[in-house]
Amino acid sequence: FHKAKVNGDRSVEVWGNGTPLREFLYVDDLARACMELLLNYDDSAAINIGSGQEISIKNLALLISEVVNFRGEIIFNTEHPNGTPRKLLDNGRISKIGWIPQVNLADGIALTYDWFLAHYKNGGTP
């Protein structure tokens, strides 16, 4: 989306039809979860760390487009696969010890894009 915006492209292509659901977690939330587990979890059972929120690829593309300020068209290319219909972790164990993510998806994307702009001035070249 950034490259398309900078290049003045009229559209961005996204593979599939946009219906698959995905879960995302901001990196600082992952770091906080790891610290919480190091300090407060001594069980041997595996534990998932996730946001517990899912979003369709279509809505994710719209959100990224908004954050990047890309005003072109998003084209969903159904000649390419959708992938797995749904990916959402069970956060039950980590929730029981009181951890919850602090950064929502929209804020996480905005923070990540701001970081990208600060570190990659030439659209991907450090």
Which residues make up each language-model segment?
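C-terminal substrate-binding subdomain of Rossmann-fold SDR/epimerase-dehydratase oxidoreductases
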Residues: F1-P126
